[in-house]
Every structure is written in structure tokens, then in C-alpha cells.
Design a protein with these regions (language model features):
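Basic, short loop/linker segments at the boundary and entry of helix-turn-helix/winged-helix-like folds
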Residues: 1-22, 43, 68
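Short, basic alpha-helical nucleic acid-contact segments in DNA-binding proteins
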Residues: 49-67
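Mobile genetic element proteins and their domesticated derivatives, centered on retroelements
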Residues: 17, 31, 47, 76, ...
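DNA-recognition alpha helix
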Residues: 28-39
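Two-metal-ion RNase H-like nuclease active-site motif
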Residues: 69-81
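Active-site beta-loop-alpha junctions of metal-dependent nucleic acid enzymes
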Residues: 102-124
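Helix-centered, glycine/charged polyanion-binding patches within enzymatic domains
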Residues: 134-191, 195-198
């Protein structure tokens, strides 16, 4: 499928613009200025539309290619500010530090954690272990899932220091708090950021 068909600008321009925005802590206007300095005149609103569209495409293609993770997962939630209000980002990574999935929600509770863990099970099956912090909602959600037959052989570990890796990975996402304008656009942007990070990590291994 040609994801660039019918676009006014060439594929290379779109890829560079989206890459600048997702990889660096830049605003859409700052990306516009960088492109203008290179002789490319494109409006910041067009760059915004590209980021929203191609972040989702990148994320979909990455997840389609990477669907197996059997050993262990690390999972937690963190705070993301969107238009002055706090939201909660659930995120899971595999044993190699690659993102399995993310989910941005308005509430942080057992129901949200339950739905995210169920979604992970549907996509990736059952790992040997899931490492989380000691948030009550995560433990409660895991026990509820086991009571209905999911994760029967998975060990749930709540050792705080095993989760330091995923906590550190939240920093680039949080640095962009001032740019998030809605739950939908923040979710798309974060998916794009996570995908580029995963691709870069894979190439460096």
C-alpha cells in the first residue's frame, strides 16, 4: 500500500518532517522553520496533519511485524498533561526494552489496567512474568484476569527496582507535555515516538 499517494509533497520531505517532530523536542512551527531553511516551504498545520497520520501508520506497521514476546514484560503507568489536565499513559515493554503497546486514558484505576492487560494478552499471548510497580490497581487487575483464566502461568513481580528502565523511558514523552492538545492527538504522537525509538533501538543492537 502506498501511504504517500496523492500528497502534495514528496515522500522524503514528509518522512524528514515527521522524523524531526517525533525524534526531537520541537514544535510544529520549529519544524516548519527547519524545513524552510532547507528551501522547503510547508505550513506547520500541514506538518501537524502528517504527524497525526503517519504516527499511526508507523505504529501499525511496527506492531504488525513484532507480535511475539514470550519471556517477560515490564508495565506501569505515568502522568501526561494534556491541555492542563492530567491523563494516564499505560505502557508495556518486553525484555529487550522494546515497546509492546501503549494506552492513554483519562483515569488510572483497576478497570483501565484490566483492559490494557487483556489487550496485551490478545496481541502477544502469555509471558513468563510481568513486572510492575506496587500500584494497587495493577495487582487487582492482574488477579481479576487470572480469575477468568488469563495469565494462569504468568508470575506477577512487584519489585520496584526491576521497573527503573521503563520509568526512565517516560522522560522524552513527558518533555512534550506542552505540545499535547487532546487525548487523540497525544496518543497518535506518542505512538509515533515509541515506534521511532523502537526502530532505532533495534538497529543499534
Amino acid at each position: 500500500m502506498n501511504h504517500f499517494k496523492g500528497k502534495q509533497f514528496k515522500k522524503d520531505v514528509i518522512i524528514v518532517a515527521v522524523g524531526y517532530y517525533l525524534r526531537y523536542n520541537l514544535s510544529y512551527r520549529e519544524v516548519q522553520e527547519l524545513l524552510y531553511d532547507r528551501g522547503i516551504n510547508v505550513c506547520h498545520t500541514t506538518i501537524y496533519r502528517w504527524v497525526q497520520e503517519y504516527s499511526k501508520v508507523l505504529y501499525y506497521l511496527w506492531k504488525k511485524k513484532n507480535r511475539q514476546s514470550f519471556y517477560s514484560w515490564k508495565m506501569d503507568e505515568t502522568y501526561i498533561k494534556i491541555k492542563g489536565r492530567w491523563h494516564y499513559l499505560y505502557r508495556a515493554i518486553d525484555a529487550d526494552g522494546l515497546t509492546l503497546d501503549i494506552w492513554l486514558r483519562k483515569k488510572r484505576d483497576t478497570q483501565a489496567a484490566y483492559a490494557f492487560l487483556k489487550r496485551l494478552h490478545k496481541q502477544f499471548g502469555e509471558p513468563k512474568a510481568i513486572v510492575t510497580d506496587k500500584a494497587p490497581s495493577l495487582g487487582s487487575a492482574f488477579r481479576k484476569l487470572q480469575s477468568v483464566g488469563l495469565y494462569p502461568k504468568t508470575e506477577h513481580r512487584t519489585v520496584k527496582y526491576l521497573n527503573n528502565l521503563i520509568e526512565q523511558d517516560h522522560r522524552p514523552i513527558k518533555r512534550r507535555n506542552k505540545f499535547y492538545q487532546s487525548l487523540r492527538t497525544a496518543s497518535s504522537t506518542i505512538k509515533g515516538m515509541e515506534t521511532l525509538r523502537a526502530v532505532s533501538y533495534t538497529h543499534l543492537r
